[in-house]
Amino acid sequence: MALELTEHQLNKLRDFLDEILLDVSQKYQKKFHPGGYQKLEELAFDLEPYFQVVSSIPLEKHTFLVTNFTLRGIDFFVDTIVGFPASPETTFKVFSLLDSLCLRLIQSGNLSTTDTIRLKSLMENCRMVVISKLSDVQGYEMDCASIFEKSLNSIDF
């Protein structure tokens, strides 16, 4: 039986996740300055709890919430990658976590066609951004090709 969150709990959860993204976004805006991020690793560390909480939300009753926060988080992370020097290990670590989260969403069978298309498009865009970002770094070509591989292979259209 899936855990059913009350309206109050859902509001607190939304506020908590919004607050994490807001805090990370504000520190990102100050990157390379005091109080801001100096490296992608720092941003990824602060963003990890966001994705851990999103991945723990029961999908059976809250697919819309999980989908929305997953899409927002992925979109935010891929936008921030370009603002830092290439950091392959951190990039692939985060995308491995995101691939698992997306795969869970896809395999739930609860995604609408529209959300599936949005998710697929975002995952493909992420691949292109990472390939472009790491084009000057040797030895990561196969890793770039594997970003969201499990999730993209699970989409049936």
Curated annotation (Swiss-Prot):
One GO biological process term: transcription initiation at RNA polymerase II promoter
Gene Ontology CC: nucleus; transcription factor TFIIH holo complex
Species assigned in the record: Schizosaccharomyces pombe (strain 972 / ATCC 24843)
Name of the protein in its database record: Uncharacterized protein C1494.09c
First and last residue of the signal peptide: none
UniProt xrefs under Pfam families: TFB6
